Every structure is written in C-alpha cells, then in structure tokens.
Amino acid sequence: FAGCKEDHLGSWFSGIENYPEGGVVRTFSRKKLEHIFDACGVGERSFYYPYPDYKFMTTVYSDAYLPGRGELSNNLRNFDRDRMLLFDEKSAFDGIVEEGLFSVFSNSYMAVIGAPLDLKYARYSNDRAESFRIRTEILRDKEGCKTVRKYPLTKEAEAHVRHMPEAYEKLKERYAGSSLDVNVCHLGEENGIPYAEFEFVPGRPLSELMDECLDR
C-alpha cells in the first residue's frame, strides 16, 4: 500500500492487486495464512509481527502485546529496492493502531505452530555503542504474570546489564519518601548470559504521551 515493491517479483502493487500477471509466487495475509493452517489441520498457533518487517526487524509484537500510538515511526528500512513515498506512514500506522487493525496491516507475519510461547514482545537496541547493545523482552507465564527482561547483545554490554540492579538501588534510595516509584530490578542468568529482570508496569508509554502533546 505504501509503495514498496513486491518482495519476490520486484514489481509495484502486484501483491495487493492479486498478481494480475499470474505466476506461482504469493505473499499471504494473516487471514489467508489461517485458512492454510486450518486446511492442513494445524491447531494451536500464535502470530507475531516483526517490525518494520522480517528483513531488518528491530521489534517483534504479538497479539498479547500490540504497538501503541506513536511507536511505529521507523518505516524506511527497505534497502533492497527503490520505493515510493505515497503518504506519511507513521500517521497511517497511528490510525491503524487506534482502530485495532495492526494485526491486519502489519508489514510481516511470523507464525509459530504449537503451544504459545512465553515471549510476547522483543526489541533489539543494536544501533548503539557495543557496550550498550541490548535486547528487551516482555514475557508472560501460564498464570498471566508479565515480566520484563533485558539481555546483552554483545560481550561488552554484559557490564551494562549487570549494573542495572545497582542503579535501581541508588534510584530507590534517591527517591525514598517521594511519590515516585522505582521499578524493581533483579539480576538473573540464562545459559551463562546475565539478564536484568523488572516487574511489568502497565501504563501509557512516553512516545504516546509526546505524540498527544504534539497534536495539541
């Protein structure tokens, strides 16, 4: 819709025009993928949404954790072919998110067949200095409890992650007695890799609040 060429053919709008020139190549909507799974007898499955798309993904959303208004602003990531800029994609995504249609208009889909995964969201912050490159995950266990974990993406970033609980203790001491609550942080380890775990705090992200201020 936004002017990127079709993935396989390199032609304009052939996917949304239902491939008028024919051929065997096809990309599918979520609804079509679900029809294929049903026809194959596939039962349990979960859908994830790589953003901006599956090629140069920075974030993965899921039905349990969908994007909010203002989050989908990093859209110019197709480096393989020329493209057209037909409209303001951030504004279009904001409208799609507000209408609850992101699962329909996501640029890419990742389907996991089988029991649901604990992982509900992941973001890769790998455009930083190597000592600060991390992955943030939101997980939900079988009881529905959510937690947030931050993993180092490089050996150099391990010190940054290990420092997070210390920063938490200093912030807690600094703001003791005030109305500001500091998110609890614990250090853990998985397969020899440290991670910082935080409680999941529901609320509205800063990006959404700032977008509202800009609108005013």
Language model region names:
Residues A2-G3, P50:
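Alpha/beta-hydrolase-fold catalytic nucleophile elbow
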Residues G3-V24:
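Short, glycine-/aromatic-enriched active-site segment of Class I SAM-dependent methyltransferases
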Residues G23-Y49:
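Short alpha-helix
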Residues R45-R83:
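Conserved catalytic loop of SAM-dependent methyltransferase domains
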Residues R77-V112, P116:
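Conserved Class I S-adenosyl-L-methionine
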Residues F105-V112, S131-T136, I193-Y195:
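Short hydrophobic/aromatic beta-strand or adjacent loop that forms the aromatic wall/cage
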Residues V182-R216:
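Conserved structural core of kinase catalytic domains
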